[in-house]
Amino acid sequence: MGKQINNTFTWVIKNLSTLQGLEVRSKIFVVGGCKWRLIAYPEVNDADGYLSLSVYLGVPDCCESLPSGWKRHAKFSLTIVNQLSEGLSQVQETQAWFDENAPGWGFPPMLNLKDVSDKYGGFLVNDEVMVAVAVDVIEVVGSLDAPEMSESMDIKGFKVLPSQVKSVNRLFESHPDIASKFSIKNQSLKTAYMNVLLCLAETLHQSPMEISEDDLSDAKTTLAYMKSVGFKLDWLEKKLDELFEKKKEEADKIRMQNIEEELKDLRQKCSSLEALLKKEKTGVLAAKAPFLFFNNVNDDDLKWILRAVMYTLIMMLFISI
């Protein structure tokens, strides 16, 4: 997930523990008419309490999209945000020429922590790391490969895009004290938090049918974190609880429908088995009927029956002669 305001781009790397030893790339963003991308290489070992993160700023698809001889000179800063204390964030700044031979620059590693208490001291929270980059393009050789971003506007101390002004104004009109306890001063981080808040509000205004269980779980984690940095979000918490309850009702309804279908199938199977059992019983009784008759006849009666049969046979023989 990544959000951009002017020359600042914020990237939240989720599920870091599952990305061990992999190259992780952000989405492409545009600064100074140039396309950029962040690249990270995480190393996480919970058993040993070890966290390492290398981060680079790079030019995406430079060989395919840019003309021969292209290069660009940029000054940039990379920040690994401490989500519990802004003052502990790790910041590195430099300037460099990006070209075909050196399309990426960064700091290996920016973060290298061992035996840090409280889940890596605020750098890794809910298995997420937040990285911010600010880029100032000094000089470009070759054509620009993307349009400029719109200028930002200031709303209650937060820098937002013109397209976000209406949404942010609506937030402060409906909830004037929403940021009354938000004390972070760094403008890049303030912008990043506002972007997260707008995304959270948008997510929680979906209908129960549109939003997934995973989205709700992520929203719950994000909401708790946003409250921890000073935002007053009781209204969003209420909305989240309502969505959880409606999703539960929806899940219960689906589960009951499934049970009813299974019960219907079982009843049909029982009915078929009862019919088969009745048929088998009828066949067994029919096969046993002659034996049941002779079982109920005593010896005298049996002698009489045999004599009658023999007499009948003799008479039939006599008649035939």
Swiss-Prot record:
The keyword Aminoacyl-tRNA synthetase does not apply. PROSITE patterns: MATH. It comes from the Eukaryota. Residues 6-135 form the MATH domain. SUPFAM superfamilies: TRAF domain-like (SSF49599). Keywords: Coiled coil. Residues 232-283 form a coiled coil. PANTHER family: TRAF-LIKE FAMILY PROTEIN-RELATED (PTHR46236:SF21), TRAF-LIKE SUPERFAMILY PROTEIN (PTHR46236). This is MATH domain and coiled-coil domain-containing protein At3g58260.
